[in-house]
Amino acid sequence: MALNKTVFFMATSAAKTLPQSIAEVIFVGRSNVGKSSVINALCFRKNLARTSKTPGRTRSINVYSIVMKKWLIDLPGYGFARVSFKEKELWNKMIEECIVQRKSKKTVYVIIDAFVGPTELDFNMVDWLKDHKIPFRIIVNKCDKVLNLVSKEEINTKTRELFKIEPESVFMVSAKKRSGFEKLQLDITKFLALK
């Protein structure tokens, strides 16, 4: 699978400096939801994306190249409280420039925490994507923390109902256990037309 050939390409704080891509998959989510860990597990790697227990570690747009001009993009987490209002505004601008203003073919994967559940910020992000007609999916990470309380089917159904999306748009994974990634890997491989 081509995803295991993914390499770090560049980091930038300005989306306008990104070269044009053929297609890209963009990961967004609340701070400390495990975006970097999801990317590592998705690509069969341990340290491709830097992880940290400190929320707000990712403060730049991190781009990973799979094959020529087909990218995974990790955006800064939203909702981290310990930054200034000005820095939050810069992050918001960075996210808008990357997702809306760039004209590359794209799909956004919104990562939510199964244990915490979707937050107001997650709903705001999904509403914003819908308003801008940006295709998106939901990844429910940290499922290992709740499977002794609820079933995967219950998580899937509740997520679909809350976000008003189709069943194929929900992916339940555990980056920590590296489980549940097969369906997500196939979805991304198909979207990016990887071989």
Predicted segments with their positions:
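Helical mechanochemical/support elements of P-loop NTPase systems and associated helical scaffolds
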Residues: 47, 60, 71, 87, ...
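Conserved nucleotide-binding/hydrolysis micro-motifs of P-loop NTPases
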Residues: 13-14, 57, 70, 77-80, ...
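Generic structural signal for conserved hydrophobic packing positions in ordered secondary structure
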Residues: 8, 31, 64, 91, ...
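Conserved nucleotide-sensing/catalytic segment adjacent to the nucleotide-binding pocket
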Residues: 68-105
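Conserved G1/Walker A P-loop phosphate-binding module
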Residues: 1-82
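Conserved C-terminal guanine-recognition region of P-loop GTPase G domains, centered on the G4
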Residues: 96-168
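Structured catalytic cores of enzymes that bind and process phosphorylated ligands/cofactors
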Residues: 32-33, 39, 62, 107, ...
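Canonical P-loop GTPase G-domain recognition
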Residues: 2-16, 145-195
